[in-house]
């Protein structure tokens, strides 16, 4: 009898040990140079996970490279956060999270790779993920924002992911650039968890900026950059207090400067961000491989989409003029707004100046209407919205001659286009 009892106990223990680990929130982010590196972010419920990667199309996984995460830490940022579940019921979320991050380096430019999240025995815990490294002279990306993924209203996420597919059907792209507010409450771990289950996160590299919704929790006063830091793995090359939320990366000929609107709300922090940007752009232009284009991204809008009033345009335009920024992208206002190239407050022929553009919302729920343009009539060339139920996104095509941005509606119809000309850099920054 004792032998039988011992056998049952050992069998139960063996069964418990055999239970697979759980992982979630897998996403591919760029390394500082996306032609040779990528950064993988994921979460696990226990230690011991890793990554296996290989060239896309290579047979089997037996020769794949296995790597352990360079960071795997217990995350408490989401503990006891007040939220709602998918049924709309009030809950306090208490997830068990080991936040993992890994940088893949020495990759081949312009090459597609595949990877799996695996356990310590190299058994798969995830579906197959893929990404394309930079390196092609011509490439495309999809630009989207403000879909406020909210599990009690799943149609928001469905609308945005369908819009991404619509952009892909119009012009096949290599990766996705988002301009913030991808979740309704950044403090709700379950919202991120549900969003990252979508197919589009398995198929592309994603780069983005933090929005105010990504920063905040359901309750007033709950907000931190750690919500973004623990759901992504962006390069740690921002200024010290803001690393992995403010950051920069190269994709082909473009230097992307990614700003944190939630930090840049005081004169002191804006001064820090501008000094950091001057250093990044100056070093890049002085390097042996200077960027052809500089693109700045943030969440908060340059102009009020309803009235045309200057918002962050007045805070940043002189710096953009000074640094020769080619394109400034933003979201937040839920209304599409764009200028032609602007330099020192005047529209130019495109040989100098910055094109300012802000994206519409894409969730079919939180769009806004426009009113008569009251300010900046000479600068703002196009506005667009479908009202409350707005869905839109952009195709961005880059080659050595120009960046072509095309706004599409939910039906894949072209609403607006603007071209950003490549400019000759006549002088280098000191």
Placement of each model-derived feature along the sequence:
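Bacterial N-terminal signal peptides that target proteins for export
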Residues: 1-6
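Active-site neighborhood of phospho(di)ester-bond hydrolases with catalytic His/Asp-centered motifs
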Residues: 143-145, 175-181, 185, 206-212, ...
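Acidic, histidine-bearing metal-coordination/catalytic regions of metal-dependent phosphoesterases
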Residues: 20-143, 148, 169, 389, ...
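Active-site-proximal segments of metal-dependent phosphoesterases and phosphodiesterases across multiple
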Residues: 151, 263-269, 287-328
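Acidic/histidine-rich helix-loop elements
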Residues: 59-95, 141-161, 227, 231, ...
